């Protein structure tokens, strides 16, 4: 499971997710990708479940790139604990995702295989996403 090796501070505030992604919003490595359409937190277990679903479907074919990393700790107090007595201990890690962020990329497979693999990954995630395809440069020209 993904998590930082070490962090400067063990606990963080929740924060707000405002605006669209300005970084990591284009395809970098593969030909196909999965792009977030709404903001949210994606946990390390959800990322791992999506990765396993994709890699099992494409088998030995292509390559999968994970473009997000869970670097935010989420704390939780034990069950049946009274209010007060400080913040709970870190329970799991999340990646903060803004709309437009590319979550996963796939390369080295056909479009049909990539579409189905990313569809399987979509169902493991708590946010709406869309399939992304790399646009080829130098396509049609307007000259007559």
Swiss-Prot record:
GO CC terms: cytosolic large ribosomal subunit
Gene Ontology terms for molecular function: rRNA binding; structural constituent of ribosome; tRNA binding
PROSITE patterns: RIBOSOMAL_L16_1 (PS00586), RIBOSOMAL_L16_2 (PS00701)
Transmembrane regions listed in the UniProt entry: none
Keywords: Ribonucleoprotein, Ribosomal protein, RNA-binding, rRNA-binding, tRNA-binding
Gene3D superfamilies the UniProt entry points to: Ribosomal protein L10e/L16 (3.90.1170.10)
Gene Ontology biological-process entries: translation
Family that this chain belongs to: Belongs to the universal ribosomal protein uL16 family.
Protein name according to UniProt: Large ribosomal subunit protein uL16
Lineage, broadest ranks: Bacteria, Bacillati, Bacillota, Clostridia, Thermoanaerobacterales
Gene behind the chain: rplP
């Amino acid at each position: 499971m993904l998590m930082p090796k070490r962090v400067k501070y063990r606990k963080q505030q929740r924060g707000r997710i405002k605006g669209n992604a300005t970084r990591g919003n284009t395809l970098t490595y593969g030909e196909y990708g999965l792009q977030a359409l709404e903001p949210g937190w994606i946990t390390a277990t959800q990322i791992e479940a999506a990765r396993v679903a994709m890699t099992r479907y494409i088998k030995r074919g292509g390559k999968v790139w994970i473009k997000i990393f869970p670097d935010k700790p989420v704390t939780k107090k034990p069950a049946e604990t009274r209010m007060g007595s400080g913040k709970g201990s870190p329970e799991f890690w999340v990646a903060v995702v803004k709309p437009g962020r590319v979550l996963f990329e796939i390369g080295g497979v056909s479009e049909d295989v990539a579409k189905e693999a990313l569809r399987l990954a979509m169902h493991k995630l708590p946010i709406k996403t869309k399939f992304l395809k790399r646009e080829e440069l130098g396509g049609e020209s307007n000259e007559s």
